[in-house]
Amino acid sequence: METYILSLDQGTTSSRAILFNKKGEIVHSAQKEFTQYFPKPGWVEHNAQEIWGSILAVIATCLSEADVKPEQIAGIGITNQRETAVVWEKATGKPVYNAIVWQSRQTAEICEELKEKGYGDMVREKTGLLIDAYFSGTKVKWILDNVEGAREKAERGELLFGTIDTWLVWKLSGGKAHVTDYSNASRTLMFNIHDLKWDDELLEILTVPKSMLPEVRPSSEVYGHTVDYHFFSQNVPIAGVAGDQQAALFGQACFSEGMAKNTYGTGCFMLMNTGETAVNSNHGLLTTIAWGLNGKVNYALEGSIFVAGSAIQWLRDGMRMVNDASESEEYASRVESTDGVYVVPAFVGLGTPYWDSEVRGAVFGVTRGTTKEHFIRATLESLGYQTRDVLCAMEADSGIELKTLRVDGGAVKNNFLMQFQSDMLQVPVERPMISETTALGAAYLAGLAVGYWESQEEIKAQWDMDRSFTPEMEKERSEELYSGWKKAIEATKAFK
């Protein structure tokens, strides 16, 4: 009887179940979207029960459509939208409030207060993160402060907190396992990434009782088993957990120090494996835990670009320049260059290395000769420039020179963008055969824990390249274009 690993990929807009075989190939997948709630401007929430329902639905659909029996599942891996916070009652399993999503800015005031009190350096030192509404800690504080009776219940030990991975493991195990992994814990603002413990000083600042917090475990081990009534009478090991970006790094087999991947989704997330060293950043990067495996912890540097794929959506929906995102490649290729046009897509501010949330988008160098093609090309090129900004920060912080960049996410299908990316970085850009690297990473972590795959060496050998893009542009020309981008950034920041 052939066995499989089931990967549950719980994202920001949808939940997916993907079956992988021993070769790391996708056998079948199912997807279900769920509701986004925007109670006030800048707030984003999800219904945690609806997310749980969507997970049960995609598991059932995936197995039945693939004609795979529950007993053929050797293990379950979970990867998740990071930072999103859920607080629920231990006794009933009912959330006391909606899940507050990573994008939500509703705790911005709490963050400002913490910064004013001078906690920034201490938080940075312990967690590798910035004080920002993006991370989970202030979201938990907000729920305890704003939901009637929540703080009292928490003090009495009646409430539990978890990021989405924790919530799903708790539900799947019938409330037996309240755990998270190192990669997710490192995004909460409450976890000390050096001594690998929840930090009492941080919890005190955020006024979060320790009794609410899950146990932190490696990213690849058996955390518990599914209860039979949630998994068709089977007790399947839940054996791998990692946050989405770290799972993608693992799925791309970036196991050695200095290897990096960039995911081109709504935004871009670039992670570089820094080995067993937590590299502190002086250039606006986050220091984070990549994964815990075989008794060791691997760290990573992370850069966040807020607008990537969403800039192409803007060309389609806002500017009506293309009918489909895929057309952008064809339009961009019709012209030799942008003819001096730069688009800075700072629609929601700028991420790494600038961290400026006040700045807004701008266009430079427009003349009477500027056409739609120039504009589309300049928008695509902005993704390449922003990635170079992040890479420069990574090389400066780590002292590691990037040899190749592995890429994944929706926009990597765009050959023009991938070629420009290689030209801008002056290193090869490698696109894998399997673009579902996030789900694959979670599957690999689970499979290693249950012996489905023997070792990371076996996984590394499975990584298969679709295409490598190598630099075709002269280095001098690349530098010239990039210095124009830096000027455009400075001018954009000056306009407020």
UniProtKB/Swiss-Prot annotation:
Transmembrane segments: none
GO molecular function annotations of the record: ATP binding; glycerol kinase activity
GO terms of biological process kind: glycerol catabolic process; glycerol metabolic process; glycerol-3-phosphate metabolic process
Keyword Cell membrane: no
Residues binding glycerol: 82-83, 134, 244-245
Reactions catalysed according to its record: glycerol + ATP = sn-glycerol 3-phosphate + ADP + H(+)
Gene3D superfamilies according to UniProt: 3.30.420.40
Enzyme Commission number, as recorded: 2.7.1.30
GO terms for cellular component: cytosol
Keyword terms of this UniProt record: ATP-binding, Glycerol metabolism, Kinase, Nucleotide-binding, Phosphoprotein, Transferase
Quaternary context: Homotetramer and homodimer (in equilibrium).
The protein's name in its UniProt record: Glycerol kinase
